[in-house]
């Protein structure tokens, strides 16, 4: 059984008790310069009329600067990959480092060994370069020359159709159909269950949605090749990449926020999870743990203005 686990936070405030009068009274002492420097450091965020300047908060922080928000730059191995793909290129991936849908396309590019440029965008500011491709301002978006397209599964299919690099879809028509069927299962059932579980605030709902997610993953595992370690055998293919970002986030998000259990030792599911975690393309596009903890706190607290995904899940609609 899955159990909810509360995550607590600690807020520390510090106030200066040094008045201008006390500073003047101690001007004859050698410490005065240090005190003035300290006073300046503490109060440099004050405006000229003595009022404290407000830090610009992201909308999903709910007006509380102690709340964590999404990261705007990759970290760890993913940051190294961003740097190595920062030069201008005809093939551009526009993404946000915390987004699992971006993660899919990014893994695909790395798996195939294609030459591309990664462009980090702030989807909550919706820059024009993104809106020119996707009027809804969502990521991932891909520009290839003067042509652009969006939606993660569509982009993965497009990269396959380029017929460059290592393929993700098998050559056998039956296995291709099998892969597309279970990719659809991931999009229709596993991903919504993931967000329902993460966003649920009532402990009973968390247990129910956790069970739903476990059940939907179980169906996928039953459809997988019995030997593995990947979905249809020894090599990573389309279904693996479709699921990989959420396998990463089971460990980095659901485990700390909802107590998601480790795979049962020796199980087919454990074998699959470990293969995904050890895959080079996955590792090269995955940031450090803190990025995911911070970026998904808003989902775990079900805050307003978090994302269109959050709104769709709360209203019972399909994913945007």
PLM regions with names:
Residues 173-174, 235-236, 287:
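Short capping/connector residues at structural and topological boundaries
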